[in-house]
Amino acid sequence: MSRSFYVDSLIIKDTSRPAPSLPEPHPGPDFFIPLGMPPPLVMSVSGPGCPSRKSGAFCVCPLCVTSHLHSSRGSVGAGSGGAGAGVTGAGGSGVAGAAGALPLLKGQFSSAPGDAQFCPRVNHAHHHHHPPQHHHHHHQPQQPGSAAAAAAAAAAAAAAAALGHPQHHAPVCTATTYNVADPRRFHCLTMGGSDASQVPNGKRMRTAFTSTQLLELEREFSSNMYLSRLRRIEIATYLNLSEKQVKIWFQNRRVKHKKEGKGTQRNSHAGCKCVGSQVHYARSEDEDSLSPASANDDKEISPL
């Protein structure tokens, strides 16, 4: 028995441990980390790991990606495989993407409200920008300290496998989708057809006042043609109308009153000509009745 029996037994035990199997590809929606995300936003686990990670379990998520991928982007070539390419060891790794772009990491996540910020489809244009290259396999015994490196390598291998099979993905989701105007702006256009037919060309609907409302409005208008803000609110609350409806009604009523006033003035002017002539004639008679005395005085004074 050698002196380093315990060390040899640990090494043999580690090498005989089966490699963690990759998760099977799910036909459902896949979520990806956007390539344009700056490095500070990509969280790396150099301290605590994924909270859902257990002993012997395999977790492929953005939180389990270490900063090793970012530091080795310039030295390790981009890796991508075809349909028949596979990973030969637990330490096999490949960095997908160019030297200036972040790797595209694939993981199976449950649907959550926060998942809406990731595009559920892969743009096929990325496949043309990343030509396939040779795999770089690194065979090394798995040690307890290299668990994070193994997770990163498996994530990169999954990304390479995902890039090698573009036919399994859903239709393209381009960036122009986010340039579409907010659909909430067209909320009025998506309403029922009855509303659109009642308001053609954006015209305001005519308010149908009841007889009680018209009576109260006419009574208030006869006492005061111009309302204050407080009085307008009181009338609107009392008649179950809006302040704008009361304001518009009084505006229209004042215009109507002016038109009626102009019409009555014209009619009065036409009748005043006769009346005025009669009055003028009466005044002339009064003047004539008073004129003889003055005329006699003038006649009496005139010979002098």
Swiss-Prot record:
GO terms for biological process: forebrain dorsal/ventral pattern formation; forebrain morphogenesis; GABAergic neuron differentiation; hindbrain morphogenesis; neuron fate specification; Notch signaling pathway; olfactory bulb interneuron differentiation; positive regulation of Notch signaling pathway. GO terms for molecular function: DNA-binding transcription factor activity, RNA polymerase II-specific; sequence-specific double-stranded DNA binding. Gene3D superfamilies: Homeodomain-like. Transmembrane segments: none annotated. It is linked to Diencephalic-mesencephalic junction dysplasia syndrome 2: An autosomal recessive neurodevelopmental disorder with onset at birth, characterized by severe global developmental delay, hypotonia, spastic tetraparesis, generalized dystonia and severe intellectual impairment. Brain imaging shows a unique brain malformation characterized by agenesis of putamina and globi pallidi, dysgenesis of the caudate nuclei, olfactory bulbs hypoplasia, and anomaly of the diencephalic-mesencephalic junction with abnormal corticospinal tract course. Residues 116-151, 283-304 are annotated as: Disordered. Residues 123-140 have a biased composition (Basic residues). The keyword Mitochondrion does not apply. The keyword Acetylation does not apply. The gene is GSX2. It comes from the Eukaryota. It comes from Homo sapiens. This is GS homeobox 2. Its main location: nucleus. Residues 141-151 have a biased composition (Low complexity). One of its GO terms (cellular component) is cytoplasm. Keywords: Cytoplasm, Developmental protein, Disease variant, DNA-binding, Dystonia, Homeobox, Intellectual disability, Nucleus, Transcription, Transcription regulation. Belongs to the Antp homeobox family. Residues 202-261 bind DNA. InterPro entries: GSH1/2 (IPR042191), HD (IPR001356), HD_metazoa (IPR020479), Homeobox_CS (IPR017970), Homeodomain-like_sf (IPR009057). Transcription factor that binds 5'-CNAATTAG-3' DNA sequence and regulates the expression of numerous genes including genes important for brain development. During telencephalic development, causes ventralization of pallial progenitors and, depending on the developmental stage, specifies different neuronal fates. At early stages, necessary and sufficient to correctly specify the ventral lateral ganglionic eminence (LGE) and its major derivatives, the striatal projection neurons. At later stages, may specify LGE progenitors toward dorsal LGE fates, including olfactory bulb interneurons. It is found in: Nucleus; Cytoplasm.
